Design a protein with these regions (language model features):
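Single conserved hydrophobic/aromatic residue that forms the stacking wall/gate
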Residues: 1-8, 12
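Interfacial and helix-entry/exit segments of alpha-helical transmembrane bundles
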Residues: 13-29
């Protein structure tokens, strides 16, 4: 970031390049969502072919329950992932504050920060905090398959239940991805609009205002 690195020249003129990068990233996310949706459909078709089921009857209570569970998994996964990001970020904030207190020359450019500790925190925290979302994504279909088999439900019904789960995950996951992509882009653009200056109720609002703080948080 030019502001953090104190780059030469007018920083705000170079924000045009940042806008281009954001546009490219948004376009790339759209392609990623589309490819993930097609991959999910292909896996679902392969699953139906492999199991030999002719259809999924959602009038059956277990299948309908798995459909709802599948719809909830992407939402819960996203919540856990965002919570993990927040926890990792706070650990980084505590480390940066510690370095500011213990190494006074950092702010004046006379002392070198301990970059390795920040990198170590980001790596360890990201791996540790993402364990639960990963277990949720991998373990849920395994549990859905094993428990009915242990109870004594026929394999064909178990296959339909897992198919209902996969259908719920696919539909909910694609819609949730589109929603988050658009919401994230809107929030980012709102923040940048305030940095450039936005007229609200006849008054110009800039960076540092309450409206800008609200858009950031």
């Amino acid at each position: 970031d030019l502001k953090l690195s104190r780059g030469l020249g007018d920083v705000y003129k170079r924000q045009i390049l940042d806008s281009v990068g954001n546009t490219t990233a948004a376009t790339g996310k759209g392609f990623a969502i589309a490819s993930a949706a097609l991959t999910s459909l292909a896996l679902f078709a392969a699953y139906v072919t492999f199991t030999g089921i002719e259809g999924i009857n959602i009038f059956k209570a277990p299948v309908l329950a798995m459909l709802f569970i599948g719809g909830m998994v992407p939402v819960v996964f996203s919540a856990l992932a965002m919570n993990a990001v927040g926890k990792a970020a706070m650990e980084m904030v505590y480390e940066v504050r510690r370095q500011f207190k213990e190494i006074p020359g950092i702010m004046k450019g006379k002392a070198k920060p301990e970059y390795d500790k920040c990198v170590d925190i980001s790596t360890k925290a990201s791996l540790k905090e993402m364990m639960l979302p990963g277990i949720l994504a991998i373990g849920t279909p395994v549990v859905i398959t094993l428990i009915p088999i242990l109870v004594g439900i026929e394999n064909q019904e178990v296959a339909e239940m897992l198919g209902g789960y996969m259908a719920g995950v696919t539909v909910s996951g694609v819609l949730w991805a589109i929603f988050q992509n658009n919401a994230g882009g809107a929030w980012d653009n709102a923040k940048k609009s305030f940095e450039a200056g936005v007229e609200i109720n006849g008054e110009m609002t800039y960076k540092g205002s309450e409206a800008h703080k609200a858009s950031v948080t």
